Swiss-Prot record:
Its main location: secreted. Residues 89-100 have a biased composition (Acidic residues). Residues 1-22 form the signal peptide. Keywords: Antibiotic, Antimicrobial, Defensin, Disulfide bond, Secreted, Signal. Highly expressed in kidney, lowly expressed in spleen, and expressed at lower levels in lung. Disulfide bonds join C29-C56, C36-C50, C40-C57. This is Defensin-B4. It comes from Ornithorhynchus anatinus. It comes from the Eukaryota. Belongs to the beta-defensin family. Has antimicrobial activity.
């Protein structure tokens, strides 16, 4: 009876261990960007587009071990707004002042 209970607990643990964060499973990214698959890739993708479980890899080292894994900082997906020079209406203003 005890052996079957221990075997059942072991099977449940093994079934759910890869999903847990920590030593046995991949660390999940808390941001929106990360790497798909169990090995690090050179390209980051949105985690919602990953068909497999996503892990966070070290950016500088590129390691996928649980010691080298860490959160990938969220990169702003919106393009930076370029500061455009304002149109110069000074000539029109000067022209209206002269004509008055």
């Amino acid at each position: 009876m005890r052996a079957s209970l221990l075997l059942f607990i072991l099977l449940v643990y093994l079934a759910h261990a890869p999903q847990a964060q920590g030593v046995f499973g991949p660390r999940r990214c808390k941001g929106k960007l990360g790497y798909c698959r169990s090995k690090c890739q050179s390209k980051q993708v949105e985690l919602g587009k990953c068909s497999t479980k996503a892990i966070c890899c070290g950016i500088s080292t590129g390691t996928s071990s649980s010691q080298g894994s860490h959160e990938v900082p969220v990169i702003n997906s919106e393009p930076a707004l370029e500061s455009k020079p304002e149109p110069q209406d000074t000539q029109e203003e000067e022209a209206t002042m002269v004509s008055e």
